[in-house]
Amino acid sequence: MRLLIGFALALALIGCAQKGAESIGSQKENDLNLEDSSKKSHQNAKQDLPAVTEDSVSLFNGNKIFVSKEKNSSGKYDLRATIDQVELKGTSDKNNGSGTLEGSKPDKSKVKLTVSADLNTVTLEAFDASNQKISSKVTKKQGSITEETLKANKLDSKKLTRSNGTTLEYSQITDADNATKAVETLKNSIKLEGSLVGGKTTVEIKEGTVTLKREIEKDGKVKVFLNDTAGSNKKTGKWEDSTSTLTISADSKKTKDLVFLTDGTITVQQYNTAGTSLEGSASEIKNLSELKNALK
């Protein structure tokens, strides 16, 4: 009996020792993880701070460029920046933050940042491990953003975000001037769909026999048209460039004005029964259904 009791006590002591060792090992592992995390946080914070020998330049889009206070042996200023935890380096003749910086990721893909001489344009490009460009993003200080994706060195999709927040998106792209699908999104999530042909974007929306069409030139100039295939009581539309207004008429009488404002919204205002003057006040079209109702 004493032998059994002694054996049981020995097993219990061994179990306690193992648990204690596991606990210590687990604690050490946690301490190492915390230490590693702390080091990474410190390194990331350090990357976002200028060294004693650097000046910091804050760009309009939130990026920071660190510029050496003195020129290097080649007579240029050294540049440094961190984008998506990738450290980029480069040189420049100027010390204002402009220039080109490059860096590599662990998978050998690359990131390239170009800041224009006037600091008003920032271009971010991504390359795969074989050095083929896969995407680019051009951000301008006035507010527009152009994003492109490429496949096998060919343009695959493109998105233009205007300074007012409205967008133009292209997919199934043949070349820079032609795309099978184009989508324009105005304020209030109003979408018009079409295509890009010969550099001109044509998007439209249909309601019954009426088609509202927007033509957008390369330079961004817009014209709006209205077409009606009805046999009788056909609607017509007249576009006025100076006011960005489409006046809709039926039976030779003006019925309403659609105004395409610079902020990307559309307003509608009715004419009186005689069609001679506007009445009431213009109201903002809040969704696609309201726009379709305005075309009825």
UniProtKB/Swiss-Prot annotation:
Annotated Basic and acidic residues bias: 28-39
Topology relative to the membrane: Lipid-anchor
Q: What is the effect of changing residue 132 to P?
A: In strain: CA8
Gene3D superfamilies given in the database record: 3.90.930.1, C1 set domains (antibody constant domain-like)
The segments labelled Disordered in the record are 25-51
Q: Where is the lipid attached (N-palmitoyl cysteine)?
A: 16
What mutagenesis or variant effect is reported for residue 42 to Y? Answer: In strain: CA7
SUPFAM superfamilies tied to this protein: Outer surface protein
Gene Ontology cellular-component terms for this entry are:
cell outer membrane; membrane
User: How the protein is affected by changing residue 253 to T?
Assistant: In strain: 21343WI, 41552MA, 42373NY3, HB19 and HB19CT1
Q: Main localisation, per the record?
A: membrane
PROSITE patterns for the chain: PROKAR_LIPOPROTEIN (PS51257)
UniProt key word Transferase: no
Question: What residue intervals traverse the membrane?
Answer: none
Query: In this UniProt entry, which cysteines form S-S bonds?
Result: none
Q: What is this protein called?
A: Outer surface protein B
Provenance organism: Borreliella burgdorferi (strain ATCC 35210 / DSM 4680 / CIP 102532 / B31) (Borrelia burgdorferi)
Organism taxonomic ancestry: Bacteria, Pseudomonadati, Spirochaetota, Spirochaetia, Spirochaetales
